[in-house]
């Protein structure tokens, strides 16, 4: 029942504490940058609570619910603060449709607009990606800007094109 949700959320947090905290937090990431169901605007201090799902999140979940009209409008989620208390965090992302949000999460500023960016502040986070999800990262697109590269013909060609465009040549 709705009137018991707040109590349930408090009890859930208490059980986590009683068990000594979370050792490993395994997360996916939504197109909006949500982790769990911590939608854009979520604060880094939040704990388990009921939230209203973002329209994009509901659309993305539609196939799991046999249509968008069947996707719940609200969900209970572990808060960002609770997630950040885990000793180890692993975030997984696969597919080209995750590449832009992964780049913003890993390389962008920490912001409540993209809750996954809070993971930058965690001392023990791994981001595991396939090549498609990593495609928009600087280290994939322009590796010569961030590390030493083995200058093979394809990379030389990409670097020359990039530099020519940058110099308007």
Label each residue range with its predicted role.
Residues 1-168:
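Conserved phosphate- and dinucleotide-binding cores of soluble alpha/beta proteins
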């Amino acid at each position: 029942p709705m009137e018991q949700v707040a109590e349930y959320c408090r009890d859930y947090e208490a059980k986590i504490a009683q068990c000594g905290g979370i050792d490993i937090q395994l997360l996916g990431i939504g197109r909006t940058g949500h982790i769990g169901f911590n939608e854009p605007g979520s604060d880094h201090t939040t704990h388990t609570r009921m939230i209203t799902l973002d329209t994009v999140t509901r659309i993305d979940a539609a196939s799991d619910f046999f249509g968008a009209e069947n996707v719940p409008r609200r969900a209970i989620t572990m808060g960002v603060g609770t997630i950040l208390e885990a000793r180890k965090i692993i975030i997984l992302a696969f597919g080209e449709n995750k590449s832009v949000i992964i780049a913003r999460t890993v390389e962008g500023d920490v912001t409540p607009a993209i809750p996954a960016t809070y993971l930058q502040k965690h001392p023990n986070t791994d981001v595991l990606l396939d090549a498609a999800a990593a495609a928009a990262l600087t280290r994939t697109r322009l590796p010569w800007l961030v590390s030493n590269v083995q200058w093979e013909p394809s990379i030389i060609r990409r670097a020359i094109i990039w530099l020519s465009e940058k110099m308007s040549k």
